[in-house]
Amino acid sequence: MSLEETLRSLSLDYLNLLINGQAFSDVTFQVEGRLVHAHRCILAARSLFFRKFFCGPDPPSGLDPIGGGSSRQPTVRPGVIPVNSVGYEVFLLLLQFLYSGQVSIVPQKHEPRPNCGERGCWHTHCTSAVDLALDTLAAARYFGVEQLALLTQKQLVSMVEKASIDDVMKVLIASRKQEMPQLWTTCSHLVAKSGLPPEILAKHLSIDVVAKIEELRLKSSLARRSLMPLHHHHHHHHHHDFGDLEDQKIRRMRRALDSSDVELVKLMVMGEGLNLDEALALHYAVENCSREVVKALLELGAADVNYPAGPAGKTSLHVAAEMVSPEMVAVLLDHHADPTVRTVDGVTPLDILRTLTSDFLFKGAVPGLNHIEPNKLRLCLELVQSAALVLSREENNASNNNNNNNNASSSAAPVYPPMSEDHSSSSSGNNNNNNNSIGNLNLDSRLVYLNLGATQMGGDDDNRHNNSHREAMNRQGGHGCDPSMYHHSHDF
C-alpha cells in the first residue's frame, strides 16, 4: 500500500467516526435545532479555537461552554453545546474537513437550493454555490482552520470566473473583509472589466472600493495605451476624453429621468447623439422611474426595448420581471418587448416569473423579495404568458401564410379565366379590406391579451375578448383587474 493510499485510509477512518454519530463521542453540539456528535481530542488537535474552548480558561465566543444557552432558557439536555455562529450545513463541512482533511464545498448536483431557481442546476458557480463557499470561508476563519480557508479561497477563485457580476461583487466584499489578497485581485479585475459605471457599482460597493476599481481601470487604460505605437497616442488621448464626455452624458441623462424630464433626454439624443441603448436608459428607467417615464422614453423611438445589458444579457423585461412590477411589464409588452428573449444563461422573463411563483407557492416567501404581493406576481405571470402565447400564434400564422404563398406560386397555370378589370379591382379592394381587418383583429387581440389599457372597442367580438380575459384573470389572480390600473403612476 502506497503512502497516498495509507493517508486516504486514515482519513476515511476518522471521517467514519463523525459519520457514525455517537460512537465514542464525548461532546455534542446543537446547530439549528439538530444534534451533532463529535470528539474533543480530534477537534482540539485540529483547531486552535476548539483547543481554547475545551481547555482554555477564557473560551472564545460563538459556542456556549455551559450548554443549553442562557439562564433564561433552561437546559433540556446537559452537556449539549449550542452553536450560534454558523449554520448546520457549514458546521458539518467544517467538521468533515477537521476529521478527514478533505471537503467538497460545492453543493450536490441538481439539489434544490434556496438561492438557485434554475431547475437541474449543477451548482458550480450559481448564487447558492457562491453563498455556501462564502459561509464556509467565514466559518473557517472564525474557527481558526486556515487550511480550509485557503482551500475555499481557491474554490471561489474558480467560481467567480463564471459567476454573475452580482456574485463577483459579493465575493469582492468578502475577500476584503477576510483579507484574501488573491481573491481580491481576481474579483477586482473582473469587476473592472465588467464595464459597469461607478454609479451602479456604488449601489453595491463602498466608496473606497469603487475608487480602487476606477484606479484599476485607469491603470489598465494607460497600460494599453503604452503598448500602442507613438503615432496612435494622440488618437487615444481624444478617445479617453470622449469616454469621459459619454460618462457625463449618462449622468445628465439619469438626472433628467429622475426628474421625469424626458424632453431633455430627447434633446440629448437629437443634439448630442446620446445612444440610449449603450447608456442603458431603459433599464435605468424601469428600475428607478415611473411607468409614465418609461412609456415616454419608449415613445421616443430611440431605445431598443429588447436590448441586452451587462454580462448577463438581461433586457428591460427581465428587470421588470425580477421587480414583479405589472405596470412595467405591461408598458414594455405594449411596446413589443419579447417575452421569450433569453439571457446569456438561457433564462427568459417567463422563467424568472415561474421560478418566483414556484418559490412563493412552495416556500411561502421569496428570499430577498419578502415584499412581493401574490396578486402582482400572478398578474405579471399572466401578462407574460399571454404575450408569449400571442407571439407563438402570430409566428405560426406567419409560417402558414408563407407556406400557402409558396404553394400558390408553385402551382400550375390558373384554371379559371381572367376576370374583368372592374371585378378584379373590386375583388382586390375587398381582399385588402379583409387583410386590414385581420391585422386589426390581431392587434386588438394582442392588446386585450396583454391587458395594457386599450380603450373599449365596438363590436361583439371585442366584448367577448375583454370578458374572456377578465374571467381568466379572475381565475388566475383571485381578483379582477381593471386595465386602467396600468395608467397610474408608480414610483420606484
Curated annotation (Swiss-Prot):
Pathway membership, UniProt: Protein modification; protein ubiquitination
Pfam family, one: DUF3420
GO cellular component, one term: cytoplasm
Molecular function terms, GO-annotated: transcription cis-regulatory region binding; zinc ion binding
Expression induction or repression: Induced in roots during early nodule formation.
InterPro entries linked to this entry: Ankyrin_rpt, Ankyrin_rpt-contain_sf, BTB/POZ_dom, NPR5/6, NPR_central_dom, SKP1/BTB/POZ_sf
Keywords: ANK repeat, Cell membrane, Cytoplasm, Membrane, Metal-binding, Nodulation, Nucleus, Repeat, Ubl conjugation pathway, Zinc, Zinc-finger
Keyword ATP-binding tagged: no
Primary site of residence: nucleus
Biased composition (Basic and acidic residues): 461-473
ZnF bounds (C2HC NPR-type): 113-127
Composition skew (Low complexity), residue ranges: 397-413, 425-439
Statement: the UniProt record of this protein carries the keyword Metal-binding: yes
Membrane topology according to the record: Peripheral membrane protein
Subunit organization: Homodimer.
Domain notes: The BTB/POZ domain mediates the interaction with some component of ubiquitin ligase complexes.
Family: Belongs to the plant 'ANKYRIN-BTB/POZ' family. 'NOOT-BOP-COCH-like' (NBCL) subfamily.
Role of this protein: May act as a substrate-specific adapter of an E3 ubiquitin-protein ligase complex (CUL3-RBX1-BTB) which mediates the ubiquitination and subsequent proteasomal degradation of target proteins. Transcriptional co-regulator involved in the promotion of leaf and floral meristem fate and determinacy. Required for the abscission of senescent organs, probably by regulating the cell wall disorganization in abscission zones (AZs, e.g. pulvini at the base of leaves).
Identification of the protein by name: BTB/POZ domain and ankyrin repeat-containing protein NOOT2
Organism of this sequence: Medicago truncatula (Barrel medic)
Gene giving rise to this polypeptide: NOOT2
